[in-house]
Regions:
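Residue-level signature of mid-helix packing/kink "hotspots" within the transmembrane helices
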Residues: 84-92, 173-177
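Juxtamembrane intracellular "pre-TM" segments in multi-pass secondary transporters
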Residues: 17-48
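Structural signature of the two symmetry-related core transmembrane helices
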Residues: 2, 105-120, 197-200
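Helix-to-loop junctions at the C-terminal end of transmembrane segments
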Residues: 90-103, 187-188
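C-terminal membrane-cytosol helix-exit motif in multi-pass small-molecule transporters
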Residues: 2-24, 207-214
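Intracellular juxtamembrane helix-capping segments at the cytosolic ends
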Residues: 143-156
Length: 227
Protein backbone atom coordinates (compact mmCIF):
# COMPACT_ATOMS: atom_id res chain seq x y z
CA UNK A 1 0.00 0.00 0.00
CA UNK A 2 2.94 2.35 0.52
CA UNK A 3 4.27 1.90 -3.05
CA UNK A 4 1.61 4.11 -4.74
CA UNK A 5 2.26 6.81 -2.16
CA UNK A 6 6.00 6.82 -2.88
CA UNK A 7 5.33 6.83 -6.64
CA UNK A 8 2.98 9.80 -6.24
CA UNK A 9 5.58 11.75 -4.25
CA UNK A 10 8.25 10.96 -6.85
CA UNK A 11 5.94 12.15 -9.63
CA UNK A 12 5.16 15.38 -7.79
CA UNK A 13 8.83 16.10 -7.09
CA UNK A 14 10.19 15.20 -10.51
CA UNK A 15 7.38 15.71 -12.96
CA UNK A 16 5.14 18.52 -11.72
CA UNK A 17 5.99 22.19 -11.47
CA UNK A 18 3.89 25.18 -10.49
CA UNK A 19 2.96 27.55 -13.33
CA UNK A 20 4.57 30.99 -13.14
CA UNK A 21 2.55 33.44 -11.08
CA UNK A 22 2.71 37.23 -11.08
CA UNK A 23 4.51 38.75 -8.14
CA UNK A 24 2.19 39.85 -5.37
CA UNK A 25 2.65 42.00 -2.38
CA UNK A 26 2.59 40.70 1.16
CA UNK A 27 -0.55 38.71 1.81
CA UNK A 28 -2.37 38.51 5.08
CA UNK A 29 -2.58 35.09 6.71
CA UNK A 30 -5.97 33.35 6.36
CA UNK A 31 -8.44 34.11 9.11
CA UNK A 32 -12.08 33.70 9.99
CA UNK A 33 -12.74 37.15 8.57
CA UNK A 34 -12.11 35.77 5.09
CA UNK A 35 -14.93 33.28 5.50
CA UNK A 36 -17.23 35.96 6.88
CA UNK A 37 -16.66 38.06 3.75
CA UNK A 38 -18.08 35.33 1.50
CA UNK A 39 -21.34 36.33 -0.14
CA UNK A 40 -24.69 34.60 0.30
CA UNK A 41 -24.42 32.66 -2.97
CA UNK A 42 -21.11 31.11 -1.89
CA UNK A 43 -22.42 30.23 1.57
CA UNK A 44 -25.50 28.64 -0.01
CA UNK A 45 -23.41 26.52 -2.38
CA UNK A 46 -21.08 25.45 0.45
CA UNK A 47 -24.07 24.46 2.60
CA UNK A 48 -25.83 22.55 -0.19
CA UNK A 49 -22.75 20.60 -1.22
CA UNK A 50 -21.65 19.91 2.37
CA UNK A 51 -25.04 18.50 3.35
CA UNK A 52 -24.51 15.73 0.78
CA UNK A 53 -22.17 14.26 3.41
CA UNK A 54 -25.24 13.42 5.51
CA UNK A 55 -26.55 11.15 2.77
CA UNK A 56 -23.25 9.61 1.69
CA UNK A 57 -22.16 7.23 4.41
CA UNK A 58 -18.72 5.73 4.90
CA UNK A 59 -17.70 2.86 2.63
CA UNK A 60 -17.50 0.72 5.77
CA UNK A 61 -21.29 0.42 5.66
CA UNK A 62 -21.02 -1.10 2.19
CA UNK A 63 -18.63 -3.72 3.53
CA UNK A 64 -20.99 -4.53 6.39
CA UNK A 65 -23.93 -4.80 4.00
CA UNK A 66 -21.88 -7.18 1.85
CA UNK A 67 -21.33 -9.44 4.83
CA UNK A 68 -25.03 -9.16 5.63
CA UNK A 69 -26.02 -10.58 2.21
CA UNK A 70 -23.50 -13.40 2.35
CA UNK A 71 -20.32 -12.08 0.75
CA UNK A 72 -17.43 -14.12 2.21
CA UNK A 73 -15.19 -11.96 4.43
CA UNK A 74 -12.18 -12.69 2.20
CA UNK A 75 -14.04 -11.19 -0.78
CA UNK A 76 -15.65 -8.23 1.02
CA UNK A 77 -13.04 -5.75 -0.33
CA UNK A 78 -14.20 -6.64 -3.87
CA UNK A 79 -17.07 -4.22 -3.30
CA UNK A 80 -14.63 -1.36 -2.77
CA UNK A 81 -12.68 -2.41 -5.88
CA UNK A 82 -15.91 -2.32 -7.92
CA UNK A 83 -16.89 1.02 -6.37
CA UNK A 84 -13.63 2.70 -7.35
CA UNK A 85 -13.55 1.05 -10.77
CA UNK A 86 -16.97 2.50 -11.61
CA UNK A 87 -15.94 5.77 -9.94
CA UNK A 88 -12.90 6.09 -12.20
CA UNK A 89 -14.74 5.14 -15.39
CA UNK A 90 -17.63 7.51 -14.64
CA UNK A 91 -15.42 10.45 -13.71
CA UNK A 92 -13.76 10.48 -17.14
CA UNK A 93 -16.71 11.85 -19.20
CA UNK A 94 -18.05 14.16 -16.49
CA UNK A 95 -16.00 17.14 -17.65
CA UNK A 96 -17.42 16.97 -21.16
CA UNK A 97 -20.94 16.43 -19.85
CA UNK A 98 -20.69 19.43 -17.53
CA UNK A 99 -20.07 21.65 -20.56
CA UNK A 100 -23.25 20.33 -22.20
CA UNK A 101 -25.82 20.08 -19.43
CA UNK A 102 -24.26 22.16 -16.65
CA UNK A 103 -22.54 21.29 -13.39
CA UNK A 104 -25.54 21.59 -11.11
CA UNK A 105 -27.55 19.31 -13.39
CA UNK A 106 -24.80 16.70 -13.13
CA UNK A 107 -24.79 17.06 -9.35
CA UNK A 108 -28.54 16.44 -9.35
CA UNK A 109 -28.00 13.33 -11.48
CA UNK A 110 -25.34 12.13 -9.04
CA UNK A 111 -27.83 12.42 -6.18
CA UNK A 112 -30.34 10.36 -8.16
CA UNK A 113 -27.64 7.69 -8.51
CA UNK A 114 -27.00 7.86 -4.75
CA UNK A 115 -30.70 7.53 -3.93
CA UNK A 116 -30.98 4.56 -6.31
CA UNK A 117 -27.90 2.99 -4.71
CA UNK A 118 -29.41 3.40 -1.25
CA UNK A 119 -32.69 1.83 -2.37
CA UNK A 120 -30.86 -1.12 -3.94
CA UNK A 121 -28.75 -1.63 -0.82
CA UNK A 122 -31.78 -1.33 1.46
CA UNK A 123 -33.65 -3.99 -0.52
CA UNK A 124 -30.68 -6.24 -1.30
CA UNK A 125 -31.04 -9.77 -0.04
CA UNK A 126 -28.55 -11.32 -2.46
CA UNK A 127 -25.15 -10.43 -3.85
CA UNK A 128 -26.39 -9.42 -7.32
CA UNK A 129 -28.55 -6.57 -6.01
CA UNK A 130 -25.83 -5.66 -3.52
CA UNK A 131 -23.21 -5.23 -6.24
CA UNK A 132 -25.72 -3.27 -8.32
CA UNK A 133 -26.08 -0.87 -5.40
CA UNK A 134 -22.29 -0.61 -5.08
CA UNK A 135 -21.98 0.19 -8.80
CA UNK A 136 -24.63 2.91 -8.51
CA UNK A 137 -22.74 4.34 -5.52
CA UNK A 138 -19.63 4.45 -7.72
CA UNK A 139 -21.58 6.34 -10.39
CA UNK A 140 -22.60 8.87 -7.76
CA UNK A 141 -18.98 9.33 -6.70
CA UNK A 142 -17.80 9.70 -10.28
CA UNK A 143 -20.42 12.30 -11.11
CA UNK A 144 -20.11 14.33 -7.91
CA UNK A 145 -16.61 14.22 -6.46
CA UNK A 146 -14.88 16.70 -8.72
CA UNK A 147 -17.98 18.82 -9.22
CA UNK A 148 -18.32 19.84 -5.58
CA UNK A 149 -15.05 21.77 -5.48
CA UNK A 150 -15.65 23.18 -8.97
CA UNK A 151 -19.06 24.54 -7.98
CA UNK A 152 -17.57 26.22 -4.93
CA UNK A 153 -14.74 27.68 -7.01
CA UNK A 154 -17.33 29.07 -9.44
CA UNK A 155 -19.41 30.61 -6.66
CA UNK A 156 -16.61 32.14 -4.56
CA UNK A 157 -14.80 35.38 -5.44
CA UNK A 158 -11.31 34.68 -6.78
CA UNK A 159 -9.55 36.33 -3.82
CA UNK A 160 -11.59 34.30 -1.30
CA UNK A 161 -11.50 30.84 -2.91
CA UNK A 162 -9.01 29.54 -0.35
CA UNK A 163 -11.34 30.59 2.46
CA UNK A 164 -14.28 28.99 0.66
CA UNK A 165 -12.43 25.69 0.18
CA UNK A 166 -11.33 25.65 3.82
CA UNK A 167 -14.82 26.41 5.07
CA UNK A 168 -16.27 23.69 2.85
CA UNK A 169 -13.74 21.15 4.15
CA UNK A 170 -14.55 22.08 7.76
CA UNK A 171 -18.33 22.00 7.38
CA UNK A 172 -18.43 18.88 5.21
CA UNK A 173 -16.11 17.05 7.61
CA UNK A 174 -18.30 17.85 10.61
CA UNK A 175 -21.45 16.91 8.71
CA UNK A 176 -19.90 13.64 7.48
CA UNK A 177 -18.91 12.79 11.06
CA UNK A 178 -22.44 13.46 12.31
CA UNK A 179 -23.93 11.52 9.39
CA UNK A 180 -21.79 8.45 10.00
CA UNK A 181 -22.52 8.46 13.74
CA UNK A 182 -26.24 8.68 12.98
CA UNK A 183 -25.93 5.90 10.39
CA UNK A 184 -24.18 3.69 12.93
CA UNK A 185 -26.92 4.29 15.48
CA UNK A 186 -29.58 3.50 12.87
CA UNK A 187 -27.75 0.33 11.89
CA UNK A 188 -27.49 -0.87 15.49
CA UNK A 189 -31.05 0.09 16.36
CA UNK A 190 -33.02 -0.70 13.21
CA UNK A 191 -30.75 -2.59 10.83
CA UNK A 192 -29.20 -1.93 7.41
CA UNK A 193 -32.55 -1.52 5.63
CA UNK A 194 -33.49 1.50 7.73
CA UNK A 195 -29.99 2.99 7.40
CA UNK A 196 -29.96 2.93 3.61
CA UNK A 197 -33.63 3.95 3.41
CA UNK A 198 -32.85 7.09 5.41
CA UNK A 199 -29.86 7.66 3.11
CA UNK A 200 -32.16 7.53 0.08
CA UNK A 201 -34.53 10.06 1.65
CA UNK A 202 -31.65 12.41 2.51
CA UNK A 203 -30.31 12.11 -1.04
CA UNK A 204 -33.66 13.15 -2.47
CA UNK A 205 -33.94 16.01 0.03
CA UNK A 206 -30.51 17.26 -1.09
CA UNK A 207 -31.58 16.94 -4.72
CA UNK A 208 -34.75 18.94 -4.06
CA UNK A 209 -32.73 21.62 -2.27
CA UNK A 210 -30.31 21.97 -5.17
CA UNK A 211 -33.16 21.96 -7.71
CA UNK A 212 -34.89 24.72 -5.75
CA UNK A 213 -31.67 26.72 -5.64
CA UNK A 214 -31.28 26.30 -9.42
CA UNK A 215 -34.81 27.58 -10.02
CA UNK A 216 -34.20 30.56 -7.75
CA UNK A 217 -30.97 31.41 -9.57
CA UNK A 218 -32.71 31.10 -12.94
CA UNK A 219 -35.53 33.38 -11.77
CA UNK A 220 -33.03 35.96 -10.56
CA UNK A 221 -31.18 35.83 -13.87
CA UNK A 222 -34.41 36.39 -15.82
CA UNK A 223 -35.35 39.26 -13.50
CA UNK A 224 -31.94 40.90 -13.97
CA UNK A 225 -32.13 40.48 -17.74
CA UNK A 226 -35.57 42.10 -17.92
CA UNK A 227 -34.50 45.20 -15.96
Amino acid sequence: ASIPAFLAVALLVGGVSDPPRPEEGARKPPSLKGALRLDAATWTMIALTAVIGLARFSESFLLMKGLDVGVPPAFAPAAIVLLHLVFGLAAFPVGALSDRIGRTSLLLLSLVFLAAADVALALASDQVVFYLGVALWGLHMGFSQGLLMTLIADAAPAHLRGSAFGLFALISGLIALAGNVAAGLLWDGFGPQATFAVGAVLSLVCALGIAGWMRLQAARSRSSASE
